[in-house]
Amino acid sequence: MDSGKDMWSRLCLLAETVVMAAEEEEQRRRLLAEKREDSKSQKKTVSEEDDSEKRFLSHVPRKKRSSLVKRQQKPNGVSTSSSSLPDLNQIPIDYETETKQNPSFIERLVCDEEQRVKKGKSRIIWEEEEEADEDSEKRLFEKNLMKFVGHSQQQQKFETLNGASSSSSFLNLRCYEASLFLDYNTVESEKTETKVLPNPNYQSSSPSSCLTENDTSRKRRAVEQRKSGKVKKVKVSPLPRLSTETPEWVFQAMGHMNADAETPKLIFERTLFKSDVNSNLSRLLIPFQKLIRNDFLTPEECRAMQEDKDKDDEDISVGTILVCQAKQEDEDKDDEDIGAGTILVNQRFKMWGLRFKIWGMEKDSGHGTLNYILNWDWNDVVKGNSLKAGDNIGLWTFRCRGVLCFALDTW
């Protein structure tokens, strides 16, 4: 009996040992399978992030320079590249599909990037770029200051010859305002730059006589206009929107583009004019004085656009040039004056690659105004959104991977 009990206990112990070993083996296999799945999911996430970044960089406007176009010309003189920008919405979402269909896709991007690095230019100003030294900012300030002082001295000599006072010529100088001395333009300076400064040497009579003369001349003009039937119509500006809250679709577009986590900023609202939708001009004019806020640019972007504007001023001050040379220089200058590359998105999440830069307008009176402009593919934006004169638009700014982006709101 004792031997039978011992045998039975040994069998039970052996069975329990086998069951425990099987359970441990099953648990070990399960842990190995989970580790493999985790490693696969991590690799997939990294590859998806890389593909997403490559797709976003492909949306950035890449306008080839004239020198690159000449190098890529065929022996018979026909250029192999197109100067027009590609439609951003026709780019495949799957980056691997684009690479398979066009094997030279990656090589072309790398070649374009290397050429821009050699030229010392960049289509996009990134936030991670190193800030310039204080010495370069001082040199830029002194350069702009000498320009304005030189212009004021020329104006002073001209007015002195005509019998005007020398002090008034400098005080009434409003060509390009003092906001250009620095990289940032302030709202206060824009408000004060439109005011005409008084002439201290002006000998006038009593204030009451000035008011009386102005009132009488105004009344005479009104009576003459009534008699002739020519009455000027008063231009009434359209009422702005009652609410300036960020539209919901702007946040949706930021999520769709995987934009940086920041609050979008409303910088500009206006009713479109005929010049804004003119296909020959192909630009949206954004006057400095109409900006709602001006803190949406980085110091690097301000410095890059200011350097492009200085080049434009130097080109204008050069003497007479032959017509053929002027045309060639205009084409080269259009390629070199990059400004800041931007992306504009509308309410349907359709995107365009544009250029954002400073543009100065000179008037017949000798004074000038400074503006921002959006150009390059602006005609496509007008067609894609059916914009026309009289439409109201608003521009919201945000950043995606450090790139300046605009959201176009219409109402």
From Swiss-Prot:
SUPFAM superfamilies given in the database record: DNA-binding pseudobarrel domain
Chain intervals for the UniProt region annotation (Disordered): 25-89, 192-237
Cell location: Nucleus
Cellular component, GO, one term: nucleus
UniProt-recorded Gene Ontology molecular function terms: DNA binding
Residue ranges for the DNA-binding region feature of this UniProt entry: 309-411
Biased composition (Basic and acidic residues): 26-56
Domain of life: Eukaryota
Biased composition (Polar residues): 74-87
InterPro entries to which the protein is assigned, alphabetical: At2g31720-like (IPR005508), B3_DNA-bd (IPR003340), DNA-bd_pseudobarrel_sf (IPR015300)
Compositional bias (Basic residues): 60-73
Name the UniProt record assigns to this protein: B3 domain-containing protein At5g38500
Protein's organism: Arabidopsis thaliana
